Amino acid sequence: MQKLIAIEGIDGSGKTTLANLLKEHLESKMKLNVIVTREPFSEDIIKLIEKIGWNDPILLVLLFAADREIHVNWLSKIKDADLIILDRYYFSSIAYQGALGVDEQWIKMVNSYFPKPDMVILLDLPIEVAISRIKNDKFNFEEKIKSLAKVREKYLKLAKEYNFYVVDASKDKNEVLEQAIKIIQKNLF
């Protein structure tokens, strides 16, 4: 499989924006063939999660792992890409479902069969900034702040454990892109 970069971060951190900007930059400036994908990936699994999964964090771990298996199987068939950028990967399960109280070691074990990314970029920002970016979503404001704070804490712990590259995502999207490009050029190409 080609080089894999996972972009992680709490809701509203700018993962999708960065993934798309990186693709554009790396294809035009470095002449790389870049594929961007995101999780959840499978429409069937997404429908199942929406129907039965959100209230059961253990079921969520398993459904996201099933989705990831479909995703990774699809990725393994791509032969002409130099780089695959993943907008979320298994670290999201560890952070989000771990924040809901699911045993992190079990989540890691469930996801241990998936390819390790060559690099993980964690987009970190204060909860208030993330909330302001996703304010159009329908959610209980107080609950969302509490849950995102727990998830952010999990991500920062994972960053130390797995040597993520942490980028300040509260900055302008072009500054975030510039930081990410420097990290990629220095450490991957």
Curated annotation (Swiss-Prot):
Q: State the UniProt keywords alphabetically.
A: ATP-binding, Kinase, Nucleotide biosynthesis, Nucleotide-binding, Transferase
Q: What is the main EC category here? A: transferase
What EC number is given for this enzyme? 2.7.4.9
Instruction: Respond yes or no to whether keyword ATP-binding is given for this record.
Output: yes
GO terms, molecular function: ATP binding; dTMP kinase activity
Please give the InterPro entries that the UniProt record associates with this protein: P-loop_NTPase, Thymidylate_kin-like_dom, Thymidylate_kin_CS, Thymidylate_kinase
Reaction(s) catalysed by this chain, per the record, are: dTMP + ATP = dTDP + ADP
The UniProt entry, under CDD domains, shows: TMPK
Coiled-coil portions: none
The positions annotated for binding ATP are: 9-16
Q: Which PROSITE patterns match?
A: THYMIDYLATE_KINASE (PS01331)
Which BP terms from GO are recorded? dTDP biosynthetic process; dTTP biosynthetic process; dUDP biosynthetic process
Cellular component GO terms, alphabetical: cytoplasm
By sequence similarity, the record places it as follows: Belongs to the thymidylate kinase family.
HAMAP family named in the record: Thymidylate_kinase (MF_00165)
Under which name does UniProt file this protein? Answer: Probable thymidylate kinase 1
**Name of the coding gene:** tmk1
